[in-house]
Amino acid sequence: MTARLQEFYKEQVVPALMKQFGYKSVMEVPRFTKITLNMGLGEAINDKKVIELAVGDLTKIAGQKPVVTKAKKAIAGFKIRQGYPIGAMVTLRGERMFEFLDRFVTVALPRVRDFRGVSGKSFDGRGNYNIGVKEQIIFPEIEYDKIDALRGLNISITTTAKNDEEAKALLNAFKFPFRN
């Protein structure tokens, strides 16, 4: 069974973007490649339990087990040695990616405190979009009573779009709430 947004993309988004940008082939139309969720955990240096709790949160949010990221090199100023666990990340592709995107746009984003829309300036120049989430409790999978601390995460949406304009049109087609 395909995800709801995956069918929406094939049936409505592709024809609309082909008309808007004058693409000749369906393969030219921008599409999502992957969504990466990354949680940087600087406080994990002092407390090893933080990593386990963050991995648990990311597992609930993404629906798959994240990878613990380790420091590439030692930084004395931050008291980090090479190989220390300093974060967790998970990459979503295919059906899980579309299901996450659906939950994120329809459920999680409206739950953000004082939400006025996401920034339209967070594109990287190559058609990819990044969003910083300050609190993991905006996701319905996280139970408010069972969290130990509020942790933010970075959500990186990678597309096949050639430029920011095409990527923004793709995200707009999926009802992304841009404020500017």
Curated annotation (Swiss-Prot):
SUPFAM superfamilies named among the record's database cross-references: RL5-like
UniProt source species: Cupriavidus metallidurans (strain ATCC 43123 / DSM 2839 / NBRC 102507 / CH34)
Family stated for the protein in its record: Belongs to the universal ribosomal protein uL5 family.
NCBIfam families: PRK00010.1 (NF000585)
Keywords annotated in UniProt: Ribonucleoprotein, Ribosomal protein, RNA-binding, rRNA-binding, tRNA-binding
Name listed for the protein in its UniProt record: Large ribosomal subunit protein uL5
One GO-annotated biological process of the protein: translation
Family matches, as Pfam families: Ribosomal_L5 (PF00281), Ribosomal_L5_C (PF00673)
